[in-house]
């Protein structure tokens, strides 16, 4: 249920600060968002997959913590990221 290498490379290119950036907050949030969106489609067909649902909730929690950190430290980057990803906040 993980993302393909090509999908990860595209996210790194879109959200990274430089070509080797794979750990910035924006990249981490973008990767988590892609994984969350992928799992949401999985749960439409596998309603009773509670084990994977727990993993989804962990990802949502991690994304929420990372976005809160980004909002606290650099509000301009936070706003740009939220608009680019289309998140609700």
Swiss-Prot record:
One GO MF term: rRNA binding
Record Gene3D superfamilies: 6.10.250.3130, S15/NS1, RNA-binding
A GO cellular-component term linked to this record: cytosolic small ribosomal subunit
Transmembrane feature ranges: none
Keywords in alphabetical order: Ribonucleoprotein, Ribosomal protein, RNA-binding, rRNA-binding
GO biological process, one term: translation
Pfam family, one: Ribosomal_S15
InterPro entries: Ribosomal_uS15, Ribosomal_uS15_bac-type, uS15_NS1_RNA-bd_sf
Similarity comment: Belongs to the universal ribosomal protein uS15 family.
Record-linked HAMAP family: Ribosomal_uS15_B
UniProt cross-references to PANTHER family, sorted A to Z: RIBOSOMAL PROTEIN S15, BACTERIAL AND ORGANELLAR, SMALL RIBOSOMAL SUBUNIT PROTEIN US15M
Function: One of the primary rRNA binding proteins, it binds directly to 16S rRNA where it helps nucleate assembly of the platform of the 30S subunit by binding and bridging several RNA helices of the 16S rRNA.
Quaternary context: Part of the 30S ribosomal subunit. Forms a bridge to the 50S subunit in the 70S ribosome, contacting the 23S rRNA.
Protein name: Small ribosomal subunit protein uS15
Source organism per UniProt: Shewanella denitrificans (strain OS217 / ATCC BAA-1090 / DSM 15013)
